[in-house]
Amino acid sequence: MSEEQTAIDSPPSTVEGSVETVTTIDSPSTTASTIAATAEEHPQLEKKPTPLPSLKDLPSLGSNAAFANVKVSWGPNMKPAVSNSPSPSPSAPSLTTGLGAKRMRSKNIQEAFTLDLQSQLSITKPELSRIVQSVKKNHDVSVESTLSKNARTFLVSGVAANVHEAKRELVKKLTKPINAVIEVPSKCKASIIGSGGRTIREISDAYEVKINVSKEVNENSYDEDMDDTTSNVSLFGDFESVNLAKAKILAIVKEETKNATIKLVVEDEKYLPYIDVSEFASDEGDEEVKVQFYKKSGDIVILGPREKAKATKTSIQDYLKKLASNLDEEKVKIPSKFQFLIDAEELKEKYNVIVTFPSTPDDELVSFVGLRDKVGEAITYARSSSKSYVVESLDISKAHSKNLTHAKNLIMYFTKYSVLKGLEESHPNVKISLPSIQSLPTAETVTIHISAKSDEANDIKAVRKELISFVNNIPPSETLVITDLDYELFGGSIKHCLLASESSVAFVQFGDYYPNDNSILLVALTEDEDFKPSIEEIQASLNKANESLNSLRTKQNNMETKTYEFSEEVQDSLFKPSSATWKLIMEDISEQEGHLQIKLHTPEENQLTVRGDEKAAKAANKIFESILNSPSSKSKMTVNIPANSVARLIGNKGSNLQQIREKFACQIDIPNEENNNASKDKTVEVTLTGLEYNLTHAKKYLAAEAKKWADIITKELIVPVKFHGSLIGPHGTYRNRLQEKYNVFINFPRDNEIVTIRGPSRGVNKAHEELKALLDFEMENGHKMVINVPAEHVPRIIGKNGDNINDIRAEYGVEMDFLQKSTDPKAQETGEVELEITGSRQNIKDAAKRVESIVAEASDFVTEVLKIDHKYHKSIVGSGGHILREIISKAGGEEIRNKSVDIPNADSENKDITVQGPQKFVKKVVEEINKIVKDAENSVTKTIDIPAERKGALIGPGGIVRRQLESEFNINLFVPNKDDPSGKITITGAPENVEKAEKKILNEIIRENFDREVDVPASIYEYVSERGAFIQKLRMDLSVNVRFGNTSKKANKLARAPIEIPLEKVCGSTEGENAEKTKFTIEEVGAPTSSEEGDITMRLTYEPIDLSSILSDGEEKEVTKDTSNDSAKKEEALDTAVKLIKERIAKAPSATYAGYVWGADTRRFNMIVGPGGSNIKKIREAADVIINVPRKSDKVNDVVYIRGTKAGVEKAGEMVLKSLRR
């Protein structure tokens, strides 16, 4: 040969010990020009070729120092797995040619491999020669071979692809086929086979290898890390093709199992509160390992790349072992009555120690679990803290004549309804511990424990007192115990009936706590009523609740009862809850939707009692009679199923058959497969052996299942791969919904467009329709458009918390995704970000327009900063910000979302006012601000003197008057606080505006605007005003309003002063023969007086109601007013009002008597008032008295108070009594 051979560094591969291969390539140091030049210098080398090239056959290429000696890398005596590639010396000169040609790498390679004689087919030398010549011709390669004692070595030269194919053909034709078996995870079998067997066919056809994937699972092959078993895949063919196919299959397995989900279960619950797995989750981008801990179930789930997940599992197991060694549990014996003193929450927070109290009343061992050094500290702290408590016991079984049963009932009532919760909340420092309901049946006393810290012992007495009151207020007569309804039959129905009356009668079903207890406790609720009902009323409410259960009693009385003879052994075997027969019986009875009770070993050990309503009892009797008539467990029954359904009936390794056997507790015999081969299209007779009742159900089940199996079909739908994700849905939502809805299996292949749907024909067709409709929708709405948006405006498109982009998505029904971040190099370079919009064509266009409008709006966004002196800021903002709001409104800011006017706080040194928004808006706002500043620069400030008591009128309710003045006259009005009497009121603004504002303030707002003024001594004001009724009379009769100036507060206080009523004297008797309905009492009390000094100023103003604007027929008419007539009416009304006030003042000294009318029925007091107050007005005018009818909410609400002269009081009293008697 004329080219130097260099061996590759990697060792040759060996397959089944029969082939050894060495692959060589042309040296890169040898060029075509070098070889040509050398050939001219040494022509003799071409004339004497040697069959086996060696180093001496190669031409000399420059200095000999450039290369080391190289052994022959092939031939009969070659030794495999040794690489002899020479490396040039560092001092070697580079090889050059006189032509200066560029060096080139040859595409040719050489590959040597060895075949053991044992693995070769027995062929003659001519046959071998014929095969070699055929390979050389078919693949355009050079093939040479040598034979040694135990092997034959081949050297194949040529283009790389051709060499590999030539080698495959040589190995295939010269060697015996082999059978290789590899184990693969069972979950990977579907991927290896592919949709419709497509993947496995491709591998088999490509490498001409027969591949068989076993349906069975290898025994003892479960791997808990993979959560899977393994199955065998066998490959038959020549060893080279088998290895290539094996590599392809293992690549699929590697891809399918690259990620793992590993579950660790923490068996011991006491470790759960202390486990923290956050440190085990790695953060390596796509290679992240996620660890989740489910505290309730105790499961630790690890998700991530398989090897990393396994390593994480090992780390967590080590962590759990270390945690287990550090945790300790100590049990301390603590009497039950003191266990409640241990604050488990406090110990958990302070020492991280979990306290578990015993579940049974007899158990006094309390468990403390935590870190070894903390458990002892926690127990010590619990002991010391409990010593600081004082505990008192209250034995409520001593109440109500030592009625122990009633005391137990009260505890059940208190527990269910948390009756004592309000008491605990009102005394937060006191703990109340009720005995557990489980301990009540055997308890000889019922003791409630009350505890508190020593320094709060007084609270215990208060709580004890209230507890005694609670117990005493619920005597046995206010409860009722019902025992005639069966809880097992009607427990749910009883609860439903009693819930309707729970607001008045509480109830406790003992069956909720104790098995086979039919007792129901009813408790009458009387706490919410003002007066406790009589015992008759309480009994009536209890009986009403009891009677609501009569419909259930009727059902119970109408129930049929029947007893069957079954031996004790048969009942324990056939009818125990876990038996297959019992489950079938319960299924049959539940279909009847009735009430049924089955009691085993009742009334005798060898008897069974059935009780229920007609429908359910009839079904149960039929079942038990059939079992009695055919009690043998050796009964036989046959069922015919299609032959093609037998495999499904049996299932994988008989799993389905075993499940059916267990479900119906019967033996199922299927004829051998050999007997069925000739009748694949016919049915197979399956024999069932067992209890006849079970066999009837099994036969029905098998017939239905066989029909379902025979109806299984597969349908295909072509779905472009890009739509797979949309049809599968997030986390498989859509696919899972269809699979569950139609009981089908839907397979989406990874790299294929054909989606398969398999299952019952009806379900497959329905699922196919829905999937096709969804695909059509996705294809219609799957159009995409990419638009470029400026990176600086991306936040504006997204909006706060994504509001803007979510609104666009919802409005136009599109998906929007930014393909880059604003910080990406490409985005920073171009200044734009790509936004992808997915949806229908029209919706995409509309959404794109919306985005463009946002970008345009953002582009129009400007910022302008004004430097304004602080003294003008208040003028710009205005009182309550009303001026600033007006500025924004005038500039059109109400319809603009992205705008702002930022004015510094009063205490800030910053003078900058920042205006942001569209150019037009900013321009208008700036103009308005500059205008205000200009006006403020030309403004004047004027001080006005206003009495301190009138400052409030200038401000108005909530500052409304001041704001109106500032807005109306464009001024700034300063009113000092009430606490600053020396403060001056100032008006700042344009001179003409200040003058107008001052005029309005002085002439309209603070002017004392009244017509007459009368001073009434405060001591008799209550009588003069008739507690406000006289003021109302002036307003209604004379159109005269009364105001009180600075004495308003005092006047209101006197008019509403509480009335002192001597209840002992005036109240009548309500009991016995002397019971009264009304009582009238009169006494002399002296002239009206009050401790208040000074006068009450009554300022009278004539304010008639103007009815001129109320026109008839909806037409406006001019009404000519007679000014002189109105003035005369005004004077007359004012004179009359003043006269009436003075008369009341003159009569006050003679109003020395008070009258009290008591009424047993306060509901009749409205008869005194009359419609619209007409009757009471009539009494006041006729008797000239003060009369006060109490409200229901008054402290004393059953006495009418009268004040006046003796004659007036007597007359008024008679009129009141007359009104009550009507």
Swiss-Prot record:
<dbReference type="Pfam" id="PF22952">
    <property type="entry name" value="KH_11"/>
</dbReference>
<dbReference type="GO" id="GO:0005789">
    <property type="term" value="C:endoplasmic reticulum membrane"/>
</dbReference>
<dbReference type="GO" id="GO:0003723">
    <property type="term" value="F:RNA binding"/>
</dbReference>
<dbReference type="GO" id="GO:0031965">
    <property type="term" value="C:nuclear membrane"/>
</dbReference>
<dbReference type="InterPro" id="IPR004088">
    <property type="entry name" value="KH_dom_type_1"/>
</dbReference>
<dbReference type="GO" id="GO:0042175">
    <property type="term" value="C:nuclear outer membrane-endoplasmic reticulum membrane network"/>
</dbReference>
<feature type="compositionally biased region" description="Basic and acidic residues">
    <location>
        <begin position="39"/>
        <end position="49"/>
    </location>
</feature>
<dbReference type="GO" id="GO:0000750">
    <property type="term" value="P:pheromone-dependent signal transduction involved in conjugation with cellular fusion"/>
</dbReference>
<feature type="domain" description="KH 1">
    <location>
        <begin position="177"/>
        <end position="249"/>
    </location>
</feature>
<feature type="region of interest" description="Disordered">
    <location>
        <begin position="1"/>
        <end position="59"/>
    </location>
</feature>
<dbReference type="GO" id="GO:0000329">
    <property type="term" value="C:fungal-type vacuole membrane"/>
</dbReference>
<feature type="modified residue" description="Phosphoserine">
    <location>
        <position position="54"/>
    </location>
</feature>
<feature type="region of interest" description="Disordered">
    <location>
        <begin position="79"/>
        <end position="98"/>
    </location>
</feature>
<feature type="compositionally biased region" description="Polar residues">
    <location>
        <begin position="1"/>
        <end position="12"/>
    </location>
</feature>
<comment type="function">
    <text>Involved in the control of mitotic chromosome transmission. Required during cell division for faithful partitioning of the ER-nuclear envelope membranes which, in S.cerevisiae, enclose the duplicated chromosomes.</text>
</comment>
<keyword id="KW-0597">Phosphoprotein</keyword>
<keyword id="KW-0677">Repeat</keyword>
<feature type="modified residue" description="Phosphothreonine">
    <location>
        <position position="50"/>
    </location>
</feature>
<feature type="compositionally biased region" description="Low complexity">
    <location>
        <begin position="13"/>
        <end position="38"/>
    </location>
</feature>
<keyword id="KW-0539">Nucleus</keyword>
<dbReference type="InterPro" id="IPR004087">
    <property type="entry name" value="KH_dom"/>
</dbReference>
<feature type="modified residue" description="Phosphoserine">
    <location>
        <position position="63"/>
    </location>
</feature>
<dbReference type="GO" id="GO:0000781">
    <property type="term" value="C:chromosome, telomeric region"/>
</dbReference>
<feature type="domain" description="KH 7">
    <location>
        <begin position="1153"/>
        <end position="1216"/>
    </location>
</feature>
<feature type="domain" description="KH 5">
    <location>
        <begin position="861"/>
        <end position="929"/>
    </location>
</feature>
<feature type="modified residue" description="Phosphoserine">
    <location>
        <position position="89"/>
    </location>
</feature>
<dbReference type="InterPro" id="IPR054548">
    <property type="entry name" value="SCP160-like_KH"/>
</dbReference>
<dbReference type="GO" id="GO:0005737">
    <property type="term" value="C:cytoplasm"/>
</dbReference>
<dbReference type="GO" id="GO:0003729">
    <property type="term" value="F:mRNA binding"/>
</dbReference>
<dbReference type="GO" id="GO:0001965">
    <property type="term" value="F:G-protein alpha-subunit binding"/>
</dbReference>
<feature type="modified residue" description="Phosphoserine">
    <location>
        <position position="85"/>
    </location>
</feature>
<keyword id="KW-0472">Membrane</keyword>
<dbReference type="GO" id="GO:0007059">
    <property type="term" value="P:chromosome segregation"/>
</dbReference>
<feature type="domain" description="KH 4">
    <location>
        <begin position="782"/>
        <end position="851"/>
    </location>
</feature>
<dbReference type="Pfam" id="PF00013">
    <property type="entry name" value="KH_1"/>
</dbReference>
<feature type="modified residue" description="Phosphoserine">
    <location>
        <position position="630"/>
    </location>
</feature>
<keyword id="KW-0256">Endoplasmic reticulum</keyword>
<feature type="domain" description="KH 2">
    <location>
        <begin position="634"/>
        <end position="702"/>
    </location>
</feature>
<protein>
    <recommendedName>
        <fullName>Protein SCP160</fullName>
    </recommendedName>
</protein>
<feature type="modified residue" description="Phosphoserine">
    <location>
        <position position="1112"/>
    </location>
</feature>
<feature type="domain" description="KH 6">
    <location>
        <begin position="939"/>
        <end position="1001"/>
    </location>
</feature>
<dbReference type="InterPro" id="IPR036612">
    <property type="entry name" value="KH_dom_type_1_sf"/>
</dbReference>
